[in-house]
């Protein structure tokens, strides 16, 4: 079809005025976050040498009538009566089902240009259409979107995923066919958001299978594609209420697969960004299904090494849940402590930041449920030899809300934190950490000098007791080593000695 048509057209190409004007445009329908789909530069332009009207007159004799009977796809919507516009729309959709190879930019360049112009015509029509789309239009649209968008990424494409490790800064791989794909995505966004689309009819064609394949595309290496998909997914979630439970379940399965199996996925941040808007729309009281999503999906998402890539979006989702139901705060903190990255200092800094955000909104009752294990962990962070971890833990005392919670529960918290502060004062190598430690000690002293002094006395007593035990243990082993040095290497039966040899045993050996 394409060859028969284009063989009658000159091969020379030039810039089309209309295409150039539209290239700088953008999709006016934003997503839940308001981000439009930006158009990049043109793939090319329509062939020159013949006027557009000449091409339209010729194409009716070249394209088979099976496209849509009596409708030639390159005719402008302005040139057909209103009764035929939807038939022309379907004809143009069928024309756009041709997919081209973009690995060679010079291959089929004229055909690519015609498809691009046709996609722009379709976008303009959806923008301006006021009549309800027929079922034939919806079916043809769904088919065209599927043909152009749905594809499987090759294994080597996924192996360079940015979600595979910590701190990776690899350049993303950009989709060579983007100049067509971006227009297909823009058309899909406008089509789903159009008031002309009846959701009751559309749900049959934008079904579970379509949604799953759309979600699979979020593993694309191209950030432009993921951004478009994020916007479209939000629009589908808002348009088709009947699909909402399925979308939540399908996204949960992606998260499960990522956390517990592959540890690799490019679109986790985008999915979480969509769900941030979804969570903010949850009705109160929260359903048990939604709480399970928090405990079994969002909290375990702190486990992967690549959590830094999507931590901002994840923290937003978690805090949205806590704002909806403050009683969830303590269980979230306990979950974070369960996944605490003891051997990963960078993640520890991130976790401390998220903990502080949660403490901003936590109630006193929920704080009291988790404060002991929480501040034991914070005390360990204060003593960390990694200065960034110690610094971030001490920065928590700059938060007025946290100070208020600590002051109300100082009888439990001071005995946990003061020993860590004293340990820092005596042993830490970093001057900035030492300065922050002194500031926190001064704050505790002003908060409750009697309690602070009592904690210091107890710390000193514990240190003296520990030093005494250490001295006795060292002396015991020195005696044991001395006794062993006078014994022959062979000739005597071995004696089983416990961890701490008794005084009688040592006397016998001597």
From Swiss-Prot:
One record GO biological process: meiotic sister chromatid cohesion
Annotated stretches, region: Disordered: 1-51
One matching Pfam family: B56
Keywords of this entry: Cell membrane, Cytoplasm, Membrane, Phosphoprotein, Stress response
Principal subcellular localization: cytoplasm
Membrane topology: Peripheral membrane protein
Effect caused by changing residue 502 to A: Abolishes salt-induced B'KAPPA protein accumulation
An annotated GO cellular component: cytosol
Post-translational modification: Phosphorylated at Thr-476, Thr-493, Ser-502 and Thr-508 by SIT1.
Phosphothreonine modification, residue list: 476, 493, 508
Entry-linked InterPro entries: ARM-like (IPR011989), ARM-type_fold (IPR016024), PP2A_B56 (IPR002554)
SUPFAM superfamilies in the cross-refs: ARM repeat
Biological role: B regulatory subunit of phosphatase 2A (PP2A) involved in salt stress response. Under salt stress conditions, required for the catalytic activity of PP2A and the dephosphorylation of SIT1, a negative regulator of salt tolerance. Dephosphorylation of SIT1 turns off salt-induced SIT1 activity directly, which has a positive effect on salt tolerance.
Subunit structure, as described in the record: PP2A consists of a common heteromeric enzyme, composed of a catalytic subunit (subunits C), a constant regulatory subunit (subunit A), and a variety of regulatory subunits such as subunits B (the R2/B/PR55/B55, R3/B''/PR72/PR130/PR59 and R5/B'/B56 families). Interacts with SIT1.
Name of protein: Serine/threonine protein phosphatase 2A 57 kDa regulatory subunit B' kappa isoform
Organism: Oryza sativa subsp. japonica (Rice)
Phylogenetic lineage: Eukaryota, Viridiplantae, Streptophyta, Embryophyta, Tracheophyta
Record gene name: B'KAPPA
């Amino acid at each position: 079809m394409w060859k028969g048509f284009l063989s009658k057209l000159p091969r020379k190409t030039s810039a089309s005025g209309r295409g150039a004007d539209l290239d700088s445009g953008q999709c006016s329908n934003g997503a839940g976050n308001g981000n439009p789909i930006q158009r990049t530069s043109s793939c090319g332009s329509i062939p020159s040498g013949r006027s557009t009207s000449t091409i339209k007159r010729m194409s009716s004799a070249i394209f088979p009538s099976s496209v849509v009977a009596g409708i030639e796809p390159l005719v402008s919507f302005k040139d057909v009566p209103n009764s035929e516009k939807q038939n022309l729309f379907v004809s143009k959709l069928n024309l756009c089902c041709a997919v081209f190879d973009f690995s060679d930019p010079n291959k089929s360049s004229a055909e690519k240009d015609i498809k691009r112009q046709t996609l722009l015509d379709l976008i303009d029509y959806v923008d301006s259409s006021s009549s309800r789309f027929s079922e034939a239009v919806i079916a043809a649209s769904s088919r065209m979107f599927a043909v152009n968008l749905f594809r499987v990424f090759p294994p080597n494409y996924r192996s360079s995923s940015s979600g595979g490790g910590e701190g990776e800064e690899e350049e993303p791989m950009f989709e060579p066919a983007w100049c067509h794909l971006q227009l297909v995505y823009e058309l899909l966004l406008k089509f789903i958001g159009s008031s002309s689309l009846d959701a009751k009819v559309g749900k049959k064609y934008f079904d579970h299978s379509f949604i799953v394949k759309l979600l699979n595309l979020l593993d694309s290496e191209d950030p432009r594609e993921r951004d478009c998909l994020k916007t479209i997914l939000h629009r589908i979630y808002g348009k088709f209420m009947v699909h909402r439970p399925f979308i939540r379940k399908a996204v949960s399965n992606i998260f499960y697969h990522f956390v517990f199996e592959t540890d690799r996925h490019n679109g986790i941040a985008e999915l979480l960004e969509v769900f941030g808007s979804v969570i903010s729309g949850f009705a109160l009281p929260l359903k048990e299904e939604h709480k399970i999503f928090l405990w079994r999906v969002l909290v375990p998402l702190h486990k992967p090494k690549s959590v830094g890539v999507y931590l901002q979006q994840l923290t937003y989702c978690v805090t949205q849940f806590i704002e909806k139901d403050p009683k969830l705060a303590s269980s979230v903190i306990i979950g974070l402590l369960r996944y605490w990255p003891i051997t990963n200092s960078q993640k520890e800094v991130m976790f401390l930041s998220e903990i502080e955000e949660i403490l901003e909104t936590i109630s006193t009752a929920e704080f009291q449920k988790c404060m002991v294990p929480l501040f034991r962990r914070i005390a360990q962070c204060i003593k960390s030899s990694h200065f960034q971890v110690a610094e971030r833990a001490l920065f928590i005392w700059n938060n007025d809300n946290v100070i208020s919670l600590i002051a109300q529960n100082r009888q439990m918290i001071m005995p946990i934190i003061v020993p860590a502060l004293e340990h820092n004062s005596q042993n830490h190598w970093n001057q900035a950490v030492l300065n922050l430690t002194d500031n926190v000690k001064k704050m505790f002293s002003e908060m409750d000098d009697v309690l602070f002094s009592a904690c210091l006395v107890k710390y000193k007593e514990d240190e003296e007791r520990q030093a005494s035990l250490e001295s006795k243990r060292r002396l015991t082993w020195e005696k044991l080593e001395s006794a062993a040095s006078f014994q022959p290497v062979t000739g005597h039966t071995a004696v089983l000695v416990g961890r701490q040899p008794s005084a009688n045993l040592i006397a016998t050996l001597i």
